[in-house]
Structures are given as structure tokens and as C-alpha cells.
Amino acid sequence: MAQLSLQHIQKIYDNQVHVVKDFNLEIADKEFIVFVGPSGCGKSTTLRMIAGLEEISGGDLLIDGKRMNDVPAKARNIAMVFQNYALYPHMTVYDNMAFGLKMQKIAKEVIDERVNWAAQILGLREYLKRKPGALSGGQRQRVALGRAIVREAGVFLMDEPLSNLDAKLRVQMRAEISKLHQKLNTTMIYVTHDQTEAMTMATRIVIMKDGIVQQVGAPKTVYNQPANMFVAGFIGSPAMNFIRGTIDGDKFVTETLKLTIPEEKLAVLKTQESLHKPIVMGMRPEDIHPDAQEENNISAKISVVELTGAEFMLYTTVGGHELVVRAGALNDYHAGENITIHFDMTKCHFFDAETEIAIR
């Protein structure tokens, strides 16, 4: 088991490209941390610096209180699973899982015990004598996980391990990795560009953009209390709707909208001196309802209808604004149809239009 401390971590390449900027994070023992962000945000580079595969340009990496910057990768007690399974095609599943242990000259009976234990956890016992070519993509990924598990490392690092799998297998493997974390009870750091993976697996999420940490928090926290517009738009599918406007009395107004703001949210706007400058209102698709209430209703025209099974995603035009509305599947909706939508203003978010930081 392991605690990690990343203190002012920097990564600058020889061409002066600054990939990771002042990265700070404390990771407790047994946490499941997910680094998430768009391509090129620095998440995989940060993971590789933890693993010892990339040199740290500045700052300190501590594992269990020991500075690891100059410690070689093989001495960090870390196991890593990559996007590509990197299995030896000529070896059996057993030999692939045992290979690293054999290189460490660990006793054969210990190797046998660990491999069989990992195979039992991962449901691979019946495949131990097969070669990777005879396995499905999900099974090959489990072998790669097994190869990491048998090392009994203090930290497990996973770099987009599910991105080569189809959608159904990704869902299945998400659950398997979460169960694996519970069984092993060890520290895991996982990199993905998929916010759904981050939301469903992490104890805490680290959202990155352009090498900078935007927010760190539990999935529910970053979803309900995003630090800025980037986080609000990145976490959640479909993304949060954004509308630019101003405050007029107790109303959020645009050229075509006038919505009443609840007193508690209006008080925050007053405290933060946001009443007389442009702001951005954010609304999750599930907080805009296709039915009329006493106030905060407006007519919308449906442009696209997506049925996901249990619900509809309605892509609508509202007074020049493009908004996504999440609706139950009890009613039918059609492109070109006009509907009345209701804004649940108790759930709205406000952001500074200039800095894009949440107003709280």
C-alpha cells in the first residue's frame, strides 16, 4: 500500500513545451484516483512521471514520504497497465502473467501461488494454458491486469486500459476494475479521456486542461459543484448548457429569455458583486424539463431527437440558444415540434463571463 505526494510537479521538454504545470496532489493509501481531460492535457505524462518513465523537470514526487524523482522505475514498487496489452504472443497466459516474477528470480512455488490467485480473481483460470491469440479483447486486457496484480506493487497505474475495447466490453471492464480495487485494497491511479469512466470508477477525479489541474474532487462534487466552465462542460453527458446574459433585479436575462433566480442564488450573486456584469448561466440537461410549471417556462423548437432507450435527448432551439433537454421516454417527441420547457432555477450554475470561474 502507498501514499503519494506530488508537489509542484513540472514537465518541460527540450523544445520548451510546458506539458505539466505546477501539479499538486496528495493521494491517500487505497484511493482510486482518475486523471481525466482531453487529449494533450498532460494526464498521461503525469502518470509516466509517477512511473519513472518520464523525467520530472521540477517539483517533488514522494511515495510513502520518500523522494522518488531519481529512483529508477524498477525500484518504485509500481505496476503499470497500458492501453496496448503488450502481451507476448508466443507465451501462454500463465507465462505472460509470470514473466516479470521470473525475471526477479522469485521462487517457482511463489510464482505459481500468485498467478493462480490473480487468475482466480480475474476469471482466467480456464485460460492459463491458452495463448493471447485465442482470447477476446476483454480477456487479453484481464491478462494484462493479472500481470500487474501478481507483482503485489504498492501502486497500480493504468493508462487508458479500456480504450481499445468495444462499448459493451468497456462497461463490463469498468465494473471489473472497480471490483478489483475493492479486492486488492491498494492505491490505483487511472488515466482516461472518458468522463464516464472517471465518474463511475473514481474515489476522486483530477480534471486537467493544458497541463493545469482544473479541479480535484469526488465525482458527485465535480458534477454538482464544478469549479469553472471547462469542468462543467467536460463532466457530464450531454454537456451542461451555457447561456450568456446579465442580472436584472431578480431575473437572469438575455435578449430572448427572462428567468427568475431563487433568493439564495441571488444572494450569492450579490455577495460576489456579479449583478452588474456579464455572467454565464449553466443548466444540466436533466434540469430543463419538457413541461410547464408556474414560472420560468419558454417555448422551444426541437431540431433533433435521440432515443437512448429509457430517455430522450432533445436538441432544441430556444430564442437563439441551442439547448439539450433530457426527457423521459413516456412521451413521444419529433423533430420540428414546438414544446414548452421549464428551467429548474434551483439547479442553475453561474459563472463569471470573463474568467469562466464558478460564482459561489
Curated annotation (Swiss-Prot):
Any one of the GO CC terms: ATP-binding cassette (ABC) transporter complex, substrate-binding subunit-containing
Positions annotated to bind ATP: 37-44
SMART domains per record: AAA
Source species: Escherichia coli O157:H7
PANTHER family given in the database record: MALTODEXTRIN IMPORT ATP-BINDING PROTEIN MSMX, OSMOPROTECTIVE COMPOUNDS UPTAKE ATP-BINDING PROTEIN GGTA
GO biological-process terms attached to the record: carbohydrate transport
Residues in ABC transporter domain copies: 4-235
NCBIfam families per the UniProt record, alphabetical: PRK11650.1 (NF008653)
InterPro entries named among the record's database cross-references: AAA+_ATPase, ABC_transporter-like_ATP-bd, ABC_transporter-like_CS, ABC_transpr_MalK-like, ABC_transpr_MalK/UgpC-like, Mo/tungstate-bd_C_term_dom, NA-bd_OB-fold, OB_MalK-like
Family membership: Belongs to the ABC transporter superfamily.
GO molecular function: ABC-type transporter activity; ATP binding; ATP hydrolysis activity
Protein name: Uncharacterized ABC transporter ATP-binding protein YcjV
Keyword field: ATP-binding, Nucleotide-binding, Transport
Protein origin, superkingdom: Bacteria
Pfam families recorded: ABC_tran (PF00005), OB_MalK (PF17912), TOBE (PF03459)
